A protein has these predicted regions:
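Surface-exposed loop/turn positions within long extracellular repeat scaffolds
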Residues: 2-8, 17-78, 83-98, 114-123, ...
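Parallel beta-helix/beta-solenoid
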Residues: 11-16, 105, 124-132
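Short aromatic-glycine motifs in intrinsically disordered, low-complexity regions
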Residues: 62, 107-110
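Extracellular/lumenal glycan-associated surfaces
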Residues: 185, 203-212
């Protein structure tokens, strides 16, 4: 319908309930999803200024717009799944420790700087924003994983002990002219089914710790950029393993 939710209304979805909201709303009360419930949001303004609490195995699915988890849109005590589908995108924060993320094709999730133990799956693109990022959870996506940085500034990305990342491709630094350090910790596994590029301009270092394993179909050590001589990325095998597929090393 054409109605809307206004005022200090609290929206509660009982256990197992399902609701789709496509209209913009202006309510300011809480939105609470009970265990097993699902709320599908098809309008960037559908939740008004509400804070959403995900309980149990509830699902909040966003099909359009840009979601910002850096604010208070998801309660930090949430334990369900945030699903991005359609053309939705979002930026999240490490404070949401209990949330699982599911990325549909053509969607993008950005991790702000911090340490993450979350489970992230799907077919979309995952981005680690500027700053130090540590992954202690499990990532399994068929899209690209990209690490962002500031031009001319060093950046660090770490896959924690026992953690795993599977992605269709990986770029350890998308920007140019700054050293990138990728740390694969003890017993961590990185599995890139396409091309693993440590840094676009070759100014990168990958450290693979004891028991750590990196698998890639193709390893790209990087190219010279803007006339600056770069020998390509450096890989340090500190008791770890590197296995390449038919694409070899370029």
């Amino acid at each position: 319908g054409d109605g809307s939710i206004t005022g200090d209304t609290t929206l509660n979805l009982l256990d197992g309930a399902s609701l789709t909201v496509n209209n913009a709303n202006s309510y300011a009360g809480d939105t609470v999803l009970g265990d097993g419930s699902k709320l599908v949001v098809g309008n960037a303004g559908a939740l008004g200024t509400s804070t959403v609490l995900l309980q149990g195995d509830s699902v909040l699915e966003l099909t359009t717009g840009t979601w910002n988890g850096l604010g208070t849109r998801l309660n930090v005590n949430s334990s369900g799944t945030l699903k991005l589908s359609g053309n939705a995108s979002g930026t999240t924060t490490a404070a949401l420790t209990g949330v699982r993320y599911e990325l549909g094709a053509n969607t993008t999730l950005t991790l702000s700087a911090g340490t993450y133990g979350n489970t992230i799956t799907g077919a979309g693109t995952l981005i680690s924003a500027v700053g130090t990022n540590v992954l202690n959870g499990n990532v399994d996506i068929t899209g690209e994983y990209r690490v962002l940085a500031t031009n001319g500034t060093a950046c660090t990305w770490t896959l924690g002990a026992g953690a795993s990342v599977t992605a269709g491709s990986f770029i350890g630094r998308y920007e140019y002219n700054g050293t990138t350090t990728l740390n694969i910790s003890r017993d961590a596994v990185m599995n890139i089914t396409g091309t693993l590029r440590i840094a676009r301009d070759g100014k990168g270092v990958m450290n693979i710790g004891s028991g750590g394993m990196v698998l890639a179909q193709t390893l790209d050590l990087g190219q010279n950029w803007d006339g600056v001589s770069a020998k390509g990325a450096t890989i340090n095998l500190n008791g770890g393993s590197l296995l390449l597929g038919s694409g070899g090393m370029t």
